[in-house]
Regions:
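Active-site region of the double-stranded beta-helix
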Residues: 4-73, 92-140
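Histidine-centered metal-chelating micro-motifs
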Residues: 75-87, 105-106
Length: 140
């Protein structure tokens, strides 16, 4: 048995995200272009509970705007600040992630989880096409 306090002081919401096999969230659009989530009123604190998950992050305000972050159970929480494009990928065995989010005034779940395609966002597409991602593996 292993009991650890995994609290996030800032958290006021929690989501359990289960991929039972290989999965991409959000999935590519109908023409095969990558899609991302972008929360305007939520910071994510994603922690892998089981398996492994890789996150792709793009933030126009960062010095290095494109990151790929590989997480496992030992990684700790990946903080994804609001206004960061993000998507996640699980391998064949799937993964379970708990997101201990911080939601801000104005949060509306019907607007915060709409996939955004790089096919119709030229700025996002340009970053994915031209910038080399910074690759991180946390928890090794």
């Amino acid at each position: 048995m292993c009991i650890r306090d995994r609290s996030v002081d800032e958290s006021n919401a929690a989501d359990l995200v289960v991929h039972t096999g290989s999965a991409i969230s959000p999935p590519d659009d109908t023409v095969g272009a990558k899609q991302f989530y972008l929360h305007e009123y939520q910071d994510d604190y994603n922690r892998v509970v089981s398996g492994e998950r890789t996150f792709e992050l793009v933030n126009f305000d960062w010095k290095y705007r494109y990151h790929i972050v590989h997480l496992n159970r030992q990684s700790g929480a990946l903080v994804i600040p609001r206004n960061t494009y993000h998507r996640s990928i699980s391998g064949e065995k799937g993964s379970i992630v708990i997101n201990q989010a911080k939601r801000y005034e104005g949060f509306d779940s019907s607007k915060e989880f709409i996939p955004r395609s790089c096919a119709i966002n030229p700025d996002l597409y340009a970053i994915l096409l031209t910038e080399k991602p910074v690759i991180h593996t946390l928890g090794e």
